[in-house]
Amino acid sequence: MAEEEQRKKIPLVPENLLKKRKAYQALKATQAKQALLQKKEQRKGKELKFKRLEWFLHDSWRQLRDRVRLRRLEVKPHGLEVPDKHSLAFVVRIERISGVSSVVQRTIARLRLKKIFSGVFMQVTPQTIKTLRIVEPYVTWGFPNLKSVRELILKRGQAKVKNKIIPLTDNTVIEEHLGKFGVICLEDLIHEIAFPGKNFQAISGFLRPFQLSVARHATKNRVGFLKEVGSPGYRGERINQLIRQLN
C-alpha cells in the first residue's frame, strides 16, 4: 500500500517534455561530433608531451598519502552513522585521480566514476559506506531527494543498449530490459531508484553514470569553480544543492 501511494505522488512525464528532451539529446550529439572533429584537427602536428619531474613527485606523494589513510581505516574503521530514513545515496567524483593508489583507482572503476563530475546512485548499506570511505578524498556524496532523482533521470538518464548509448525517452526500451522487474516506463524507473528495493542493483546498473555539466568559467577559473563545488566527502542532504548546480 505504501509503495502504491508513493507511485501516485509521482506526476507523469508530459509528452512535450520527452519531445524536448529528444531534441536536446540530438543537439548535444551533434555538438559532441563537432567537438571531436575539432579535437582531431588540433592533435595533428602536436609535439609529444613529457611528464615533468614535479609530477612524478606529486604522484608519489598522493600514493603515500592514500596508503597511510587506508591503513588507518583498517586499524580504526570508524564508520559514519547514517540516519535510518535514508536508503539512497548519490556519489559524484569531483577530483582527478591520476597518480593515486591502485586500490583507489580500482574502487573508482568499480563505482563506474571514470570521468570527473560523473555521478551514480547507490543503495546505502554498511558495505557502501566502507567503499565510499576508500575514495572519500576524491568524491562527494549525500542523500538526494525525489526531485533531484527525477530531474537527473529526465535530463541526463541514459542506457547502453547493443553497444549504443541511448537517452531514456522510449518506454519500450525500458520495458524490454527491465520489464522482468516490473519496470515498464520512466515513472517506474524513477520510483525504483528513489525508493531502493531488492532489484535496485540491476535497475541502477541499467543506467549509465550521469555526466554532469561544468560551468563555462571553470576552465578559466578552476580554483574559483572548485570553491563553488565544495570539498569532497560526505555532505548529507546538501548534495541536492550540488545536483541543482551541475545538472
UniProtKB/Swiss-Prot annotation:
SUPFAM superfamilies per record: Ribosomal protein L30p/L7e
Keywords assigned by UniProt, alphabetized: Ribonucleoprotein, Ribosomal protein
Domain of life: Eukaryota
Pfam families assigned to the protein according to its UniProt record, in alphabetical order: Ribosomal_L30, Ribosomal_L30_N
GO biological process, alphabetically ordered: blastocyst formation; maturation of LSU-rRNA from tricistronic rRNA transcript (SSU-rRNA, 5.8S rRNA, LSU-rRNA)
A GO CC term attached to the entry: nucleolus
Any one GO molecular function term: structural constituent of ribosome
NCBIfam families attached to this UniProt entry: uL30_euk
Family to which the UniProt record says this protein belongs: Belongs to the universal ribosomal protein uL30 family.
Protein name (Swiss-Prot/TrEMBL): Large ribosomal subunit protein uL30
Organism: Sus scrofa (Pig)
Gene that this polypeptide is encoded by: RPL7L1
